[in-house]
Amino acid sequence: AHDRAFSRGVLVDLARPLLRIPNLAIHLNRNVNSDGLVLNAQSHLAPIFGLATEEPESLRDLLVDELAARGAPTRHEDIVSWDLSLYDVQGATVSGASSEFIHSARLDNLASCFAATQALARAPQTHATTRVIALYDHEEVGSRSAQGAYSPFLRQVLERIAQAGDALDAEAFARAISRSFLISADMAHAIHPNYADRHEPNHAPVLGGGPVLKTNVNQAYATDGEGAARFAALCRDVDVPLQHFVVRSDLPCG
């Protein structure tokens, strides 16, 4: 809502199939399997919202209806701007002979976000250390948004925490960082039985085989010898198997 004094943000989840990006029928693109699927972001990725009519329903109409259904009637002119996020509304499911597979959108990397959040919530309280998790957004578009990994927000928060005891101690943050241990948690590629040649032959993680330490010759991952040793020790302490993943030297990593 908006008036001359302020604007107020409201989260709205329409939670139903609304848009679709239809692919071209193979009858009109018969070489797609041999030439590969080539998409132009401008021409081919526009989602279909509805049929063209004399009075098409607008996004603002949908928002007004949704807010009214929530008991928050809103005028069209009160909706002045929005940030849109599209997501697959198909629910997660399990499959496999023993129901061992999870099929879901956004596993990369909501799986690590969920595990980190659960670990932080269940960690014993102590005043000796400050436990922090950072869950960033917009990795796939460059991480340069206000909530992306390039944002200064986390550093500013940590600096304030470090200096909370003594605001005049300019070195408190630097000392805290030097005594800290960071884990960059992401998803790992298990070996794909149909494309086994895309994996480094001596390092092929399997699903359900335990967490994975990822190493890249071009230093694209955070793993180094000391960090790997610490992580391996943590796994041993809780009797969790550890796997290793190495990117093929002739392929880039994700």
Residue ranges, per PLM feature:
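N-terminal hydrophobic/helix-forming segments and targeting peptides
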Residues: 1-253
